[in-house]
Amino acid sequence: MVRARRGVLLKCDPSIKALIVQIDSERHDIILEELDETHLLVHPTKVEFIKMELNRLLSKNIYNPLDEEEEEH
């Protein structure tokens, strides 16, 4: 039987997909379907939340020398 679901198709590299899966593991309301290693079907109202969470996670992993200067002063 065929099911139709409204969603947004995301194409991303496997490392970003892993981060989105990690975000979804906490909430269980983001990913509708994992299609393959680079495609996800996600809930249409969660796209902005995914962007914000990815930016937050990725910014924690970026080295910024200016941060060290601020801590020294």
UniProtKB/Swiss-Prot annotation:
Subcellular location, principal: nucleus
GO CC annotation, single: transcription factor TFIIH holo complex
Record localization: Nucleus
GO biological process: nucleotide-excision repair, preincision complex assembly; transcription initiation at RNA polymerase II promoter
Keyword Transcription: yes
Superkingdom in the source lineage: Eukaryota
UniProt cross-references to InterPro entries, sorted A to Z: TFB5-like_sf, TFIIH_TTDA/Tfb5
Alphabetically ordered keywords of this record: DNA damage, DNA repair, Nucleus, Transcription, Transcription regulation
Reported function: Component of the general transcription and DNA repair factor IIH (TFIIH) core complex, which is involved in general and transcription-coupled nucleotide excision repair (NER) of damaged DNA and, when complexed to TFIIK, in RNA transcription by RNA polymerase II. In NER, TFIIH acts by opening DNA around the lesion to allow the excision of the damaged oligonucleotide and its replacement by a new DNA fragment. In transcription, TFIIH has an essential role in transcription initiation.
Assembly mode: Component of the 7-subunit TFIIH core complex composed of XPB/SSL2, XPD/RAD3, SSL1, TFB1, TFB2, TFB4 and TFB5, which is active in NER. The core complex associates with the 3-subunit CTD-kinase module TFIIK composed of CCL1, KIN28 and TFB3 to form the 10-subunit holoenzyme (holo-TFIIH) active in transcription.
Protein family membership: Belongs to the TFB5 family.
PANTHER family tied to this protein: GENERAL TRANSCRIPTION FACTOR IIH SUBUNIT 5
UniProt-recorded name of the protein: General transcription and DNA repair factor IIH subunit TFB5
Gene this chain is encoded by: TFB5
